[in-house]
Amino acid sequence: MKLNFPLLALALWSAAPVLADAPEILDVAIEKQGMDWQLSVTIRHPDSGWDHYADGWEVIDAKGKRLGYRELMHPHVDEQPFTRSLRNVMVPDGMREIYVRAHCSDGLWTAEPVAVAVPF
């Protein structure tokens, strides 16, 4: 079988964004605050600057409905891992598990959302 190296190089080059690192969630803490919840999420991501950085994380239910979103306003090149919180997350009564996933500026999400037990 003869390999077409220019075609192979083009295929590898076009897949480069897919090979970028997605954010990794290391820890999630959840705390009841009145009728709402606060989540504190610890993320690790190889931020390189404004060209590629973890730019947010979201809280979703089992069906993927967004319950909250925390925008990350700048790269954390020299602060890894880092923790950021989101207040006033409304979790529907009776919901015992929510999920958190992080996003980066390259459009990648955490490989698998992290399940978080909602204390009752």
For each of these PLM feature ranges, what is it?
Residues 25, 36-38, 81-85, 97, ...:
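Intrinsic-disorder/low-complexity, polar/charged segments enriched in Ser/Thr/Lys/Arg/Asp/Glu/Gln
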Residues 21-57:
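Short, surface-exposed binding/anchoring microloops in extracellular/periplasmic proteins
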Residues 109-118:
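Edge beta-strands of extracellular beta-sandwich domains
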Residues 69-108:
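Short, solvent-exposed, Trp/other aromatic-anchored flexible loops in extracytoplasmic proteins
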Residues 32-35, 59-66, 90-96:
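A short, structured loop/turn motif at beta-sheet edges
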Residues 14-17:
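N-terminal signal peptide c-region/cleavage motif recognized by signal peptidases
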Residues 52-77:
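The feature marks short-to-medium sequence segments in extracytoplasmic or secretory-pathway proteins
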Residues 1-7:
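Bacterial N-terminal signal peptides that target proteins for export
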